[in-house]
Amino acid sequence: MISKKTSRRAVLRAIAASPALGLAPPFSFAAETPLRLGTSTAGGGFTLYGETLARAANARAGETLVVPVGTNGTAENLRLLADGRLDLALIQGTAASQALAAEDASGLRIVFAMYPSPGMLAVPRGSPTRRFEDLKGQPVVFGVRASGLVLLARQVFGAIGLDVDRDFQAVYVGQAAESPERVIDGEAAGLWGAGEGWPGFARLAASPRGARFLGPLPEQIPRILAAHPFLTAMAAPAGAYPGLDADLPTVGSWNLILGRSDLSAERVRGFADAVHAAARELAAALPQAAMTTAAQTAKATPAAALIHPGTAALLRELKLLPG
């Protein structure tokens, strides 16, 4: 008989090892008393968010509740959760949905909502590019292979008949911080990314080359949503970056903080309480973190049974879940 633990690991490894995520070799971490939170590579949006979240939550708690752990991103985070080498992890929305769809086999539960990640392509301000298709045959930076951004790119481009590896000169990097530099230096014509406050977009937009942002064509959005039900229609808000002068319709998903289901309710409740209490500080420190709230966690959850009991207790206390 296959144990639940074995089944859980098999499910998460299958998701993490999918071609879209290109799993890299796992890191080795020593066990620590604080909760270990998997983030991403240096310069990545998840790294910035995770470090900001940990500082705010720990300050509110008056102790070190959580420590951010650098990883290769979503794919590695899923594997490390499955192996028990992380307690919590930042997971790109569609990968999170796939893992949660496995229910008990995944061994994961939602601990808190992060923020939505509308997918976009950035090009230098002077570029003639107006559509994704205009970059066919040109070098485009898609990010770290194991990141959720690459998974999102494959889903979005694939649904409109484009293969990121066949139709473009796909550029993958070892560290997220390298991505905008490839465009700034003229080595690539475009940069794929997602969300408000993403460091790669901020770096390109602030450079002398500037940035202009593109989403799918309006008629392409329904095709993408039909192909990938885990994605939703959303808009990148005007002013999120210099060069984004109007709301940009696109598609994306809610990124989530997932945790192992075998974590005690007490530990998770302590973390959730600290994050909830730090909501104002998080919003002031990072624009996208304004969406990291208890109310958004309740809204972003597909089913109450998928919420970790520790977080569920907080949400019930706040009348955001039925008692």
Predicted regions: what they are:
Residues 107-115:
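Short beta-strand-centered segments that line the small-molecule binding cleft or hinge
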Residues 93-95, 103, 127, 164-263:
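Pocket-lining segment of extracytoplasmic ligand-binding domains
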